[in-house]
Structure formats: structure tokens, C-alpha cells
């Protein structure tokens, strides 16, 4: 679908990468999955970029190769789980294994306004699955959401369209997940023109 607006999903080995793509396609926007080492020129046409979760720690030696120049692109970027931690580390924040990982349902408190929170209720249920946590804010970012356990669960840059979530909006246990992804698609200004019927044609 070369003439359609599309979002790029960078796959860090997450079982959820294809689910992320599926959720975005259900919103009517075509999605392509790429390796995180991809050259930036392959992403220039994307309306937005999503960094998936992954099973590795950002400190592991065998992490998937990542092209850091991707984070210098002008499109909106959304990091999820591993992608959230990777973005925080890249921009000078701290990530650590605090021994207080979160696995399962959690309640998200909204701390600051964000385009991601449009039509999303405060204290909404989200799905967490992480051992490492962001423990210190990266430069230029603010916390827009936290869990009751105190996890820095949602960040956004104060000047650039950079967002990151520790939780998984693509799974149904995150009750407002579809709305959050829809809000990201909206701020990417991606026109919903994709459908399975058109793809088959």
C-alpha cells in the first residue's frame, strides 16, 4: 500500500509487535514491521514510529541492534515497555532493576495533560509486564502517568512529539488501550484509509 499513510513498528523481539500492528490496522491505518536497526531513510515516509516491547533488558549484551538516529527523526515516536526504557536511557534517564517489577493489571494515574489521554479516564486499568523500570527522568521529558506502585509509567517530551509507556496499550487488559493508540494515530496525522478488503484487492 505505497500510497497510503502508514506507521512503522520496530520489533525488539516482543510477542506483541504483530499485535501492535494489528491494533493500528484495525484503526484503519496501514502498519509495517521493521527491525530496529533499519536505516532512517526507510522510515522517512512513515507518519509515526512505535518501538515495541521486548524480552531483553536494555543493559543486556545481546539486545537487538538499534539505530539511535531513529530517535532524531521528526515524526511522532511512541515507545512501549522495552521501547519506553530504551528511549529513557537514550535521552539520559536512568533505568534499573529495582526489584519491584510489575506483572499484571495496574491502575494508571494521569499526572499531566497529554494528547495520549484524550477520552481516557484517570485511574484506568493497564497491563504491565516488566522487571526493569525508569528511575530517573531523561532530559526534556515529563512524567504524564504513574502507577500506584510509583512506577514512571508514561513520559512525554516537552518540545518534541516523543512519548513512552511502560505498559502495553495493545493488549485488551489495558482497558483504554485502543483509545490511546487511536490518539497516537491522530497526533501522527495518519489518514485512516487502509482495510483488509483494499489490501486483498
Predicted features and spans:
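Flexible gly/pro-rich beta->alpha loop and the following alpha-helix that scaffold active-site loops
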Residues: 4-9, 14-80, 84-85, 91, ...
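Pocket-forming structural segment of enzyme catalytic cores
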Residues: 64-80, 85-179
Amino acid at each position: 500500500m505505497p500510497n497510503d499513510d502508514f506507521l512503522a513498528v520496530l520489533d525488539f523481539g516482543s510477542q506483541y509487535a504483530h499485535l501492535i500492528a494489528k491494533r493500528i490496522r484495525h484503526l484503519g491505518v496501514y502498519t509495517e514491521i521493521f527491525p530496529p536497526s533499519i536505516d532512517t531513510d526507510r522510515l522517512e515516509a512513515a507518519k509515526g514510529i512505535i518501538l515495541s516491547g521486548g524480552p531483553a533488558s536494555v543493559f543486556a549484551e545481546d539486545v537487538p541492534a538499534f539505530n539511535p538516529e531513529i530517535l532524531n527523526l521528526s515524526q511522532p515516536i511512541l515507545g512501549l515497555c522495552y521501547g519506553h526504557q530504551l528511549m529513557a536511557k537514550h535521552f539520559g534517564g536512568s533505568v534499573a532493576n529495582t526489584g519491584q517489577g510489575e506483572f499484571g493489571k495496574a491502575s494508571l494515574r494521569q499526572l499531566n495533560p497529554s494528547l495520549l489521554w484524550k477520552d481516557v479516564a484517570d485511574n484506568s486499568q493497564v497491563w504491565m509486564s516488566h522487571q526493569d523500570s525508569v528511575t530517573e527522568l531523561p532530559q526534556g521529558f515529563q512524567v504524564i502517568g504513574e502507577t500506584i506502585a510509583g512506577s514512571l509509567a508514561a513520559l512525554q517530551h516537552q518540545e518534541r512529539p516523543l512519548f513512552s509507556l511502560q505498559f502495553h496499550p495493545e493488549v485488551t487488559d489495558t482497558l483504554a488501550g485502543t483509545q490511546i493508540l487511536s490518539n497516537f494515530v491522530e497526533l501522527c496525522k495518519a489518514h485512516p484509509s487502509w482495510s483488509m478488503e483494499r489490501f486483498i484487492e
